[in-house]
Amino acid sequence: MTATPAAQPRERRLVISGWAVTSPYGLGRRSFAEGLLDGTKATSAVDGGQWPVPYGEAGLIPGFDIKAVLGRKGTRSMDRATGIAVVTVGELLEDFGQGLAADPEKTGLVLGTSGSVQSIMDFTKDALTGEKPYLVDPARFPNTVMNCPTGQSAIRHTLKGPNVTVSGGSATGLLALNYASRLLRGGHANALLAGAAEEFSVQRARLERVADHGGAEADPLGEGAALFLLESGEAAREGGRRVLATVLGSRFRAFPESGRAGAALARCVAEVLADAGVGPEDVALVAPGTPPGQLGKQEESALEGIGGERIAVRPLVGDATAASAAFQLAAVLAHAGAQPALVDRLALVTALDRDGTVGATLLRLG
């Protein structure tokens, strides 16, 4: 009898092998990288006629029009958050999706979002003020559900693998990346698109304006999406994709009161470095969340002793809320692409959300 060779386990190392961004710099990762590396401020004066909001400036995607970008088919009732997500998923697949279509059941999407408060409020208003017998446009109801951008993106781009929506404020992008890592290690997919999206809207602006920002003035709001192709190093090589970064680990904690956010983040950072067997002095690049007020000061304190260049994204693109950490991760990849000396160096991305979540993700670049 001839013994059947045991199947070789797939490589467990998870890598980022592609990325796409829709941001206040415009469509595409090139415009994002150029604006970020030049230090160009992407926020600008708000057109009060189009956007009656209590903000003088914001980081809007320039000239973004869903029908102009995606066409009229299937977009009549699509809201802004969904449109941003669908566009960014399409860009990532177009540039890095070679071979993924061969097995769509093994390619999925993990998208972080805050949902669309504009869609929720508009639909509620229609339900209370609309004319009988219908009162509301039923085609717009899906926009009120948080997983609408994820589901619509998967349908439009034929992603039949795991379809997951996560939400965690400013830490959402890191939470999505971590969730996708768990799915891949559990054998639920061969490749996952992971990231986060956020929309600018009148209702979001009004809510954010009256929120607690740690005793500081609220930052201008931003919008956009950043998505990353996550897979094993082996799968990346088979697909002809270059490894842009290896995910070494993530850690998250909750803090019960705002004064303890810094201590919680410091523990996350210490743990993720220890798990990777590296020290604070080994970090070459840090992309902090830089929230306003006391949270920002606590983040600075938590990162004392961590080496490396700091990348501040929020002052350039505004407060992108759910997309914030995803933009920070995209900024790390943009810097790595422009600086060959960063290959095989470590990058740290951190996030603090005022609702009680902190997180840290460690990457090895190249």
Task: Briefly describe each language-model feature range.
Residues 20, 110-112, 167, 192-198, ...:
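Short beta-strand segments
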Residues 30-33, 118-133, 185, 207-216, ...:
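A glycine- and small-aliphatic-rich helix-loop capping segment at beta-alpha/alpha-beta transitions
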Residues 85-95, 146-149, 154-159, 163-195, ...:
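Active-site-proximal alpha-helical scaffold in enzymes
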Residues 6-9, 100-103, 133-134, 146, ...:
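Solvent-exposed alpha-helices and their adjacent loops that cap or buttress functional pockets
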Residues 72-90, 138-145, 163-175, 211-226, ...:
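Active-site pocket-shaping loop/turn-to-helix segments
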Residues 15-16, 37-152, 156-157, 163, ...:
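Conserved beta-ketoacyl condensing-enzyme motif
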Residues 188-211, 215-217, 250-262, 287-300, ...:
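Acyl-CoA/ACP chain-elongation machinery
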Residues 9, 13-17, 22, 30, ...:
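Condensing-enzyme catalytic core mediating Claisen C-C bond formation in acyl metabolism
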